[in-house]
């Protein structure tokens, strides 16, 4: 319902505009979680966070230092959904029409959150998941530090496998038949608007 504005920085090197996106997308040196799950079990998390906690400009590949974040935030602009930047820095597109302004700021642009700490918290969450199977730390850091909604690991893995719910159906179950001791059958459907 809102116009869904997102915060854009200008690269200190090439001056190209890019979204200070929620999540870990700008930490493009960071390996994928599948690779990290093995590494974080015994690795020095602080050293890994220091190494991978660098934002990478998607235009020129430069890695501005964290000390530039305040300057980048001061020069940042809010861009509504439907608008993008050309290579010359011109805003083009049609902004979404709404009487409600909405803003989504990723943790990467948060004033009191260092890039290194965002990566470190993610790595600690992955370590906890790898050692205990608990997703609580991952969920917390994703929601609060990264500014992203958390998706449970089994859904991420199912999405990555390319399987649909229909592909995972158990073939030996008969349709419209319930076990003999069943006392009640409840059915619910969650319908998202427009989907």
List PLM regions with ranges.
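Cys/His-rich short segments
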Residues: 2-106
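Generic alpha-helical structural element
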Residues: 3, 46-49, 130, 134, ...
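A contiguous, basic/glycine-rich beta-loop/short-helix subdomain that forms a polymer-engagement track
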Residues: 79-188
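Acidic, metal-ligating active-site segments
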Residues: 187-195
